Amino acid sequence: MADLLAFIHTVPSLVGLFTSLAQEILPADVEVLHIADEILLKVVLAKGGLTPFIFQRVADHVIACERAGADAVQLTCSSISPCAEPAARLVEIPVLKVDEPMVDQALLLGQRIGVAATAPTTLQPTTELVRQRAAAAGRTVEVEALLCHGAYEALFAGATETHDRIVHEHLRTLMSRNEVVILAQASMARVLETLPTAERRVPILSSPRLAVERLRQILAGGAGA
């Protein structure tokens, strides 16, 4: 029986990105299903953080995925990453945070880590995850987090060039002071396509590809689960 992977999104536009990555990286017989729930991010932004409603709704989605036959669930939004552990206790399949592989790779690349975000609700979860993973690995890190004010609003207004310009400006600042920079949201991965390679003074990591590569390892029975 073919493996089935479930992706839970808060931004519908990410369905296409993760579908493409799954087709490129995962075995051909792996099936994927997507749940795109815009309400999650809208409530998180409106409330300024996670609420019991969000934890319950994510858990409901995860349980539904397991009942549909999913072998693993991948959350694709850093804002809801803290919901992974509580939801995982309710099922018998892995529930994965999208940014863990990215953070783990960043820890291998430097001690000074810059975090760029366009949504304010992702800064704290991502920064905390860096510190948690560093502590688990026995590493000492310095974390600098910057919010790209106006970029998120520009993206959802369709002003992608404005979004990219704002993010690029903040990336240049972070690159000047850190050894590696991570993008706190999967929706930010697009900026790497428009940032000239010559300007990348330090590695800049995004989460989508690394997350799907970890899924491939999990399906193969390797580390990462």
Where are these regions (language model features)?
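Non-catalytic structural scaffold of enzyme domains
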Residues: 1-225
